[in-house]
């Protein structure tokens, strides 16, 4: 019990000494040991890394989960060390509503069939989003969170300890300075020639004793200063090594950032592929749903393409006049070899990107090759008939640059 009380009293005295030193430094009444410029740069870089890591972490969480209530719920589950329940994505919820609407409105109607197709696509988009969130959380958010909750807490603890060691060092310096000043004053008083007519001899004896006491106090203060300096140097070296480890944290964050970009690229590529498949499905059935739809105008002339996009040029493509011998759009899609190009109204087009045919009715394309294109009545405006040699098939307009 006595030992605990002595330790408590000692800790209270140290805390009071540090508080006095800190207060005097703030008011400019005490000297402060300054760290070297390199150490200050390390501290500034560490603080900047911590601040920006927190911002990037929070904003990435917003990107992956825009709902703030859901983020708070996930945070509470993590703090309670409980598994976060599986959550339905917005795409999956939309797919569910569309499927239910198709079942109620009639799955065999054109609208119901389209709802079912879009529902399947939205379901795949929701699954891709779920995979992206899971991958990004593991490969990007978790390392950033581990840095803030692990490495940074260790750095902060050692920095606080270094601050305490510095306050102890400066307090020892101030104590030594005061002891030397008192010793010098006592020495001056002891060297004065006594005047026995006015002063009692015992006062000079007391002055000599005080000088000896201050000598002991100076020796004690110097010893405490050396010990405090040793502790400060040791703690400064430990803190310096931790701060220099921020470079390793940057390398780790860079690797995690590459993983995040990779997962995001995969996610958007999956979304693009799913939507492209959906667009093809809807385009193949559009002729049957809207049999009276025609593309463009019968005028062969068209303005220059330098200021128009590939999508808008489809509106200026010539259309094969409707004749008695021309098969319906559905039949033309199946018997493209029997479709003859119009005598006039064909155009040349340059392929912008490689395109792989999805089925036998489409024409595979290679970038930068030239093909002949034209349109048929009732075709989807996003598609044209392309010819290359003795091969022909449907080609997407967005992959072409129509030439004058």
From Swiss-Prot:
It is found in: Cytoplasm. Residues 1-27 are annotated as: Membrane-binding amphipathic helix. Residues 24-291 form the BAR domain. The keyword RNA-binding does not apply. Keywords: Acetylation, Coiled coil, Cytoplasm, Phosphoprotein, SH3 domain. The modification N-acetylmethionine is found at residue 1. It holds the Pfam family SH3_9. Belongs to the endophilin family. Homodimer, and heterodimer with SH3GLB1. This is Endophilin-B2. It comes from Rattus norvegicus (Rat).
